[in-house]
């Protein structure tokens, strides 16, 4: 879980502010710090993007401005706590950081200490989340700079919503209603978490993107290896991150830290899985990308397996691995003479219990008599199906005592069994007491391995996600994109989420793919055409493919050539935010203003309608000005879907339109995007589909005809 603190102050520029941010990850004990300027303090896009990447469980905000505090709180939503400036003591921040830093040494963090707002954000973090109250953190935290630009693609909340990147609820994490659900073919808990992180943090480094593509390509080609890897290996890997957190706590607190023997066996089995993965991945040597597999996966796995040799010997020596395979986690009797003696006593008692059971079965003629656990009260008893109750009572003496009578079973005991059960409990109690000390020593040694457990978890989850990408590519016919900085070309691009939904619902018509082509020389594309004609789907498809490429996935096209984008901006619809006193039109303008202030030449912008909430002439003027600014001053790739046909006259714009077929005043949407400008928007035809009264439609067409004559 991550906790985040934000400290903000107004800058000398009335429209800007300076922000410091501190994040604490309680699983890795890493405190990340950064500070940055927000050039537009009405939207705070950089802060919003970082919070979406981090996905914190709790946020604390401290500001010297009520207006800024209100805006920050709006971004942080319900997870936010307000910390007063007077509550924090930044003068003590350096001393507090030294108490938490590994070895108490701050010399490695001099650059961070010079960032005033970062340090103040740390003070807010330490105050709100009581970091210094947890002595297990002392001299055990690593400080690092949190990258603001140049490491991950920046995405805002509007983009996550417009592209359906994440599932709306955890219950939909496997459904194809979101990109996460579509790609989530992961087999391990760590893989599912890693996929969520990758979707929040798309890459912007070409070499890292290509590395992921190489591995996906290799696993797609080696289908048999991938299937074994997923079904026989990764599906058995437990949540190593949780176990690592327990082990780290155990080492820091010098206790068992909540570590169970089952956890240690889980790590043991994960190492065995890593050994199997090495063998499977080495079968891909014929692939042209095997060098990448070797460098990124096989060699690191082999190093980790070697690092675990001592751990594996510890577990094999201390634990009864035969019992562990049956789901019973016990200290091996051969490890301790006292445990061996108690185990022998236990076996003798169990043999006597079996002799009593066999005697009753022989006496009653009921072979199905079993020794079972009764729940009320909890104890061991004999069990038969209910129809044998009278047979038991008639064939045995009066010493039989009923323990439990259920709908389908009868549980009973005898004085002899009761004595044996009492003896068994006594021996088991002594066994547990003796094993507790051994368990504590075992955990103490095992806890020192938590750093490499973390590395193993990271590597196995990475393999899991890349294997899921390969499986998704096989299912949905995704192709590897060629990365090119100067153009975006896709042949037969499909919106894979809509396609998946059509297949699931039995929709008869196949998804209509479209070609996408845009480059630096013609970086503005105006898309016109009727509502429901496919304009929105077309521009979302372009953005979705760009995102999929930069997380390392293949894309839904026949062929694809894509650049690496620094960010994606989506302005695709708005609604009134009455609680904030913001109208639909104002919301549109705020979003558009944020885009033109923060977009750069490497941005991808998709706009689906703009300027509808004011007069037609004013809306058109604003749409024209914003489109021209994105085209000329910023120079980014822009897809602009609109009903303002006049925007097609922007010099240098490429015009495309959604096609429709009209026959006998009925409209049929073809969902094909072709070159040129739409003849009209077909609004009255769509109104007819919506069930408008014919008289209203006729009146609308008459008024439209008269207006067009006046304009002419």
Question: Which residues make up each language-model segment?
Answer:
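Extended, charged coiled-coil "arm/hinge" scaffolds of SMC/Rad50-like chromosome-maintenance ATPases
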Residues: 401-444, 460
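Charged, surface-exposed helical/loop "interaction arms" that form contiguous linear patches used
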Residues: 430-483
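Secondary-structure edge/capping motif, primarily at the C-terminal ends of alpha-helices
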Residues: 219-223, 244-255, 278-288, 360-363, ...
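ATPase nucleotide-binding head domains, primarily ABC-like/P-loop NTPase cores
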Residues: 115, 387-417, 466-712
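Charged catalytic and DNA/RNA-contacting regions of genome-maintenance
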Residues: 1-218, 236-245, 258-351, 355
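C-terminal helical "lid" subdomain and adjoining coupling/linker elements of P-loop NTPases
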Residues: 250-269, 694-712
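Amphipathic heptad-repeat alpha-helical coiled-coil/stalk segments that mediate oligomerization
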Residues: 94-95, 269-348, 376-414, 464-526, ...
């Amino acid at each position: 879980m991550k906790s985040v603190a934000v400290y903000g102050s107004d800058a000398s520029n009335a429209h800007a502010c300076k922000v410091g941010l501190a994040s604490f990850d309680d699983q890795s004990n890493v405190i990340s710090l950064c500070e940055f300027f927000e050039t537009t303090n009405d939207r705070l896009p950089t802060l919003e993007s970082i919070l979406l990447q981090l996905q914190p469980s709790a946020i604390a905000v401290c500001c010297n401005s009520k207006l800024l505090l209100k805006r920050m709180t709006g971004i942080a939503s319900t997870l936010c706590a307000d910390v007063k400036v007077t509550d924090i003591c930044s003068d003590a921040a350096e001393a507090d950081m030294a108490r938490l830093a590994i070895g108490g040494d701050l010399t490695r963090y001099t650059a961070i200490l010079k960032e005033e707002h970062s340090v103040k954000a740390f003070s807010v973090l330490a105050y709100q989340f009581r970091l210094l109250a947890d002595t297990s953190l002392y001299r055990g935290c690593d400080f690092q700079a949190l990258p603001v630009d140049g490491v991950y693609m920046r995405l805002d909340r509007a983009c996550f919503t417009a592209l359906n990147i994440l599932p709306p609820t955890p219950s939909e994490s496997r459904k194809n209603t979101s990109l996460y659900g579509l790609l989530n073919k992961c087999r391990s808990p760590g893989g599912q978490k890693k996929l969520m992180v990758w979707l929040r943090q798309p890459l912007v480094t070409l070499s890292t993107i290509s590395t992921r593509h190489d591995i996906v390509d290799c696993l797609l080609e080696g289908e048999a290896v991938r299937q074994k890897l997923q079904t026989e290996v990764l599906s058995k890997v437990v949540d190593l991150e949780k176990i690592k957190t327990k082990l780290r706590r155990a080492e820091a607190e010098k206790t068992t830290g909540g570590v169970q023997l089952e956890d240690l066996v889980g790590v043991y089995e994960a190492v065995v899985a890593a050994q199997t993965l090495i063998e499977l991945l080495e079968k891909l040597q014929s692939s042209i990308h095997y060098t990448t597999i070797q460098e990124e996966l096989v060699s690191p796995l082999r190093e980790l397996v070697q690092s675990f040799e001592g751990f594996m010997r510890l577990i094999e020596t201390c634990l009864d691995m035969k019992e562990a395979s049956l789901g019973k986690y016990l200290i091996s009797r051969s490890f301790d003479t006292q445990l061996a003696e108690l185990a022998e006593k236990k076996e003798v008692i169990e043999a006597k219990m079996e002799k009593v059971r066999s005697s009753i079965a022989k006496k009653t003629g009921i072979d199905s008599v079993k020794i079972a656990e009764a729940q009320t009260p909890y104890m061991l008893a004999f069990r038969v199906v209910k129809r044998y109750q009278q047979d038991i009572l008639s064939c045995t003496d009066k010493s039989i005592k009923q323990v439990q009578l259920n709908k389908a079973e009868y549980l009973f005991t005898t004085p002899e069994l009761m004595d044996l059960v009492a003896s068994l409990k006594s021996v088991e109690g002594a066994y547990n007491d003796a094993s507790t000390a051994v368990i504590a020593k075992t955990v103490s040694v095992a806890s020192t391995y938590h750093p490499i457990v973390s590395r193993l978890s990271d590597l196995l989850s990475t393999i899991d996600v890349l294997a899921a990408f390969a499986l998704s590519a096989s299912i949905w016919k995704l192709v590897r994109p060629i990365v090119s900085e100067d153009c975006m070309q896709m042949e037969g691009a499909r919106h894979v989420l809509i396609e998946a939904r059509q297949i699931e619902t039995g929709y008869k018509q196949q998804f209509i793919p479209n070609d996408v082509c845009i480059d630096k020389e013609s970086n503005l594309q105006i898309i016109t055409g009727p509502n429901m004609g496919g304009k929105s789907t077309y521009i979302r498809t372009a953005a979705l493919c760009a995102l999929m490429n930069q997380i390392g996935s293949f894309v839904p096209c026949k062929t694809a050539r894509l650049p690496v984008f620094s960010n994606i901006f989506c302005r695709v619809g708005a609604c009134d935010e009455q609680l904030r006193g913001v109208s639909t039109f104002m919301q549109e303008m705020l979003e558009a203003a944020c885009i033109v202030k923060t977009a750069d030449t490497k941005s991808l912008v998709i706009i689906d309608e703009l300027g509808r909430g004011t007069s037609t002439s004013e809306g058109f003027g604003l749409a024209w000005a914003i489109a021209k600014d994105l085209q000329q001053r910023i120079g980014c790739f822009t897809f602009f879907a609109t009903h303002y046909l006049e925007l097609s006259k922007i010099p240098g714009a490429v015009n495309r339109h959604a096609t429709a077929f009209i026959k006998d005043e009925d409209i049929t949407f073809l969902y094909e995007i072709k070159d040129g400008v739409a003849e009209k928007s077909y609004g009255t035809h769509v109104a007819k589909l919506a069930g408008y009264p014919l008289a209203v439609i006729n009146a609308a067409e008459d008024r439209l005809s008269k207006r067009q004559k006046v304009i002419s």
